[in-house]
């Protein structure tokens, strides 16, 4: 059980495809917490029939341009005309990706800490062998948008999507996402692609965009959070006052607490 989880920002999270995660017992969770971390996030019952408060955003079918609305089809075509979409190497992303990352995060509605260039480069240099990179290039061969994906045996997680805000009006996201969907679902015939779990911070509109434009859907699941004793006490005390707490990190933690089922 322990090798299936890893610590990310003080939380134990599952390392593999969400459809393979199972419910943990309290003793399983405590075993992880004894090794470190502040909490264990456990999701199970992937794509259940019940409309729970928590979900993953996935796409498991691909119908070419025909499945899209007339407006979206035109936007995809414009994007493909304006940009060249292709798989790229880690070296290509290292060369041009950080400037795009900074421009994208500075445009978010909610203040988000941008990683340093050293953190950005270390992430790419130490990425797993399953990591795949995509880029959208303008006619001057400048990177306008990129994606960092984790491609497993039967699924692909779109882990990071960033675009230069100046290129959004030229439909760069439409072209990039359409081509990745086509590649993973039609060409490689994976079970599904996903854009992660329900957004807690809602600092970008990417998930509603994917649902409305590209027919991604909510794959509902159950969420259970197991805390260290002291964090559980803090959460219990603060939760009734969650609407009045200004700190965004604490707000996010309390919001996720309320999504359990």
Residue ranges and their predicted role:
Residues 1-5, 45-65, 187-261:
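Active-site/acyl-donor-binding loops of N-acyltransferases
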Residues 1-45:
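N-terminal accessory interaction module
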Residues 22-29, 117-119, 173-179:
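Well-ordered, non-membrane alpha-helical segments in soluble/globular domains
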Residues 1-8, 42-49, 61-169, 184:
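A conserved beta-strand-loop-helix scaffold within acyl/acetyltransferase catalytic domains
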Residues 130-233:
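Aromatic (often tryptophan-rich) hydrophobic motifs at membrane interfaces
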Residues 20-23, 93, 197-203:
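Acidic-and-aromatic substrate-binding clefts and catalytic sites of carbohydrate-active enzymes
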């Amino acid at each position: 059980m322990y090798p299936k989880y890893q610590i990310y920002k003080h939380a134990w999270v599952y390392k593999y495809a969400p459809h393979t995660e199972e419910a943990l017992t309290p003793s399983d969770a405590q075993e992880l917490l004894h090794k470190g971390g502040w909490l264990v996030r456990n999701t199970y019952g992937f794509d259940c029939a019940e409309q729970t408060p928590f979900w993953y955003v996935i796409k498991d079918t691909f119908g070419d341009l025909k499945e899209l609305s007339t407006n979206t089809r035109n936007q995809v075509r414009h994007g493909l005309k304006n940009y060249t979409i292709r798989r790229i190497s880690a070296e290509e992303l290292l060369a041009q990706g950080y400037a795009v990352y900074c421009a994208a995060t500075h445009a978010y509605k909610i203040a988000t800490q941008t990683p340093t260039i050293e953190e950005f480069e270390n992430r790419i240099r130490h990425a797993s062998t399953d990591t795949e990179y995509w880029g959208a290039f303008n006619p001057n061969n400048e990177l306008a948008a990129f994606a960092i994906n984790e491609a497993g045996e039967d699924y692909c997680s779109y882990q990071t999507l960033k675009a230069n805000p100046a290129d959004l009006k030229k439909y760069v996201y439409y072209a990039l996402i359409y081509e990745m969907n086509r590649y993973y679902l039609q060409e490689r015939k994976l079970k599904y692609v996903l854009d992660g779990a329900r957004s807690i911070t809602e600092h970008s509109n990417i998930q509603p965009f994917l649902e409305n434009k590209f027919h991604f859907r909510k794959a509902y699941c159950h969420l259970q959070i197991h805390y260290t004793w002291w964090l559980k006490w803090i959460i219990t005390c603060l939760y009734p006052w969650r609407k009045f707490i200004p700190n965004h990190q604490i707000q996010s933690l309390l919001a996720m607490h309320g999504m359990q089922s």
